[in-house]
C-alpha cells in the first residue's frame, strides 16, 4: 500500500480572474488534501499559475502590457482569491519559477536522447499583416469536428484536440484578417512510439478503476482513433526556449511545459523532491482537473514521463469534473454574467458557505447549473436548518441546564452502531473522491442527531430524568465533535469555530471518531450562520445577470445618440395662432436665430393660453423631420416634462436663464468644448430613445446634465422637478 498522497490541481492560466466554475478543481483538491491529513497520511498539495504560452501573450497584447507584468498581476489575483477561500496549498507557485526552465529542458533532452522527438516541416498559418507565424491560440475558426467557434488548440464544445490548420474559416485574432499557409519547422513528440507502454499503463489504471467513467471514456476514444505525433514547439517569444540547434528562436508549447510545472513548483519548497516525484512505489499521484484537461493528464504528461525512461511517479487517481455553469448563461466578465472569485468576496457571504454549496453540487458526473434560488434554499435548509441548528440547539441547551463541564460517559451502543456505519461510508466516499456523497453523508449524520433531539424531547425530561437527559445530550455533544472533524475538509473555518466551543481540546484526526475522548468543557457557543434573505439573493441575481451591463450599454448608447444625432435649440415664440380645423393645436412662429425662423405645431391649447407663451423662450428638437398636422407643416417639436400623474409643463428657458438668445444649442455637459456635429433629420422615435429625464429639477441623460452651449447654464424643469421629457 502506498504511503504518501501527492495531490495536484490543474494549473490555472494567469490570463483571467477565476470564476466559480474554475474554483471547482482547487477546492476539490483542497478537500481531499485535508481529508488525507485528517487520516494521518503524509500529504503534499501542489498548485500554481500556468504562465507561459499564447494565452498569456495574447492577453498581454490586449491589456497593452508585457507578459511578465501580466503574470505578476494575475498571479496575485489568483493567490488572494484562493487565500480568501481558505485553500491550504503546501505551495502555490508559478511556472516562471527558477527551476522550471531546467526541468522542462532536461525532460525534453531525455526524450530526444531516447528517440521520442521527431522533426517535421509543416504548414502553419502566417499573418501577412502582423508578419508572424500564428500559434494555435492566435487563430480562431470553426471546429472541423462539431462546427463550434473555437481557438486553434482545443475545442471547448467537444473537447477535441485540434490541429490548427484544420480550422474552418480561420482568422488572426490580432488583426482579424485571413492568414495564409506558410512552411515552417517544428519538433514533435512521437506518441505512436510510446503507444505500447502508454496503453499497458492505462490498462492497469482502468482495471483498478482509479479514474472516473468520463476520463476513461475520453482517453480510450482518443487511443482508439490512433495516436499521432504531436507538436511540442511554437513560434512565440514568451515561453521556455528549446535547447536544440536551429530551434533557438522557438519555445515549448504550453501543453508540454505546464504539467511539468507540478514538478518544478515542488522543487521550490522540497529539497528531496524526488521522494515525491520519483517514488512510484510509495506515492499516490492524485490529480484534480476539469474535463477539458483530461487528455493532457492521461495521455500527454504520462507520455513525457514514460518516454524519459526514468522512475517518475505516475498518475494513480484522476478526479475529473464536469462544468459548473451559471443560471443557464456563460460565465463572462465582459458581459457581466456569472460570479467570479473577486465578486464572491464582495457579497458578504462567508467563504465556508460558498465552499459548502460548491461541494454540495460538485459536478462529478454531469454539468451543474449554479442557481441563486437553489443556493439560498440549500444554505438555509441544509447548512443552517440542519447542520448549524443541531450544534446550536444541543450546546445551548446543555450549557443552560447542565453547565460547562462535559462528563466522560459510556457511549450509547445502539446510537453509535448506527453512526459508526455512517462514518465508514463517509470515509469511503472521501477515499473514492466522491466528495459530494461524503458531504451529504455528513448531513445525514447531522439529521440523525436532530431527529434524536426532537424525538427524545429533552426540554420535557430534564427535570424528571436529569441523568438520562444529560447522557442523551453528551452523546450528541460527542457527535458534534465528530461532525466538526468530518466537516473540516469542506468547511475548515466552521470546523475551527466548533472546536473553539470546546477550547480546541482535540485535533482534526479520525482517531477521535466514535470515541469519548478529547472533550472536557463547553467554553462558549454561538450561532454559526445567519439565514440568507431573499432580498440579498434577488440583488445578487440582478447584479450578475448581465442586465446591469445591458443597462450600462443602453446608457452609453443614449449618450452617444444624443451627442451624435439630436440637436436641441432655444427659440423665442413670436406669434401663436390656432388651427382653424383643430382648436387644440397651436401654430407657433419661432425665432431660432436665423432669418427664416421656424414653425411648429403643438397640441398644448389645453394647457396654456397664447398670452402665457408669446415672448417666452422654449427648447425644440431642431432636426426633427418635417411633418403635417391637419394640413399645417411643423418643423420641430417643443420639449416638456410630464410626471407620473400626467402633469405637463413646457421647459421655459427664462426659468433658469436671464435674457436668453434664440438659436443657442443645448448640449450634454460632457460635450463641453467638443466640436459638435450638425446631425441629419430624425423621427420622433429616435429622439425618445435618448431618454431625457428631469431629476430634482435638472434635465439629464443618465446622470449627465443638459446645458446651454455658450452660457453653460443647466437646463431646468422648475415646475415639475421629476419626470420624463417629451
UniProtKB/Swiss-Prot annotation:
Cofactor(s) needed: Zn(2+)
Pfam families with a match to the protein in the record: Anticodon_3, tRNA-synt_1g, tRNA_bind
Subunit structure: Homodimer.
Alphabetized InterPro entries for the sequence: aa-tRNA-synth_I_CS, Anticodon_Met, Met-tRNA-synth_bsu_C, Met-tRNA_ligase_1, Met-tRNA_synth, Methionyl/Leucyl_tRNA_Synth, MetRS_core, MetRS_Zn
Residue ranges of domain tRNA-binding in the record: 562-667
Sequence motif 'HIGH' region, location on chain: 12-22
Gene behind the chain: metG
Compartment annotation: Cytoplasm
'KMSKS' region (motif): residue ranges: 330-334
Native source organism of the sequence: Borrelia duttonii (strain Ly)
Name by which UniProt lists this protein: Methionine--tRNA ligase
GO cellular component: aminoacyl-tRNA synthetase multienzyme complex; cytosol
Family in the record: Belongs to the class-I aminoacyl-tRNA synthetase family. MetG type 1 subfamily.
Biological function: Is required not only for elongation of protein synthesis but also for the initiation of all mRNA translation through initiator tRNA(fMet) aminoacylation.
Top-rank taxon: Bacteria
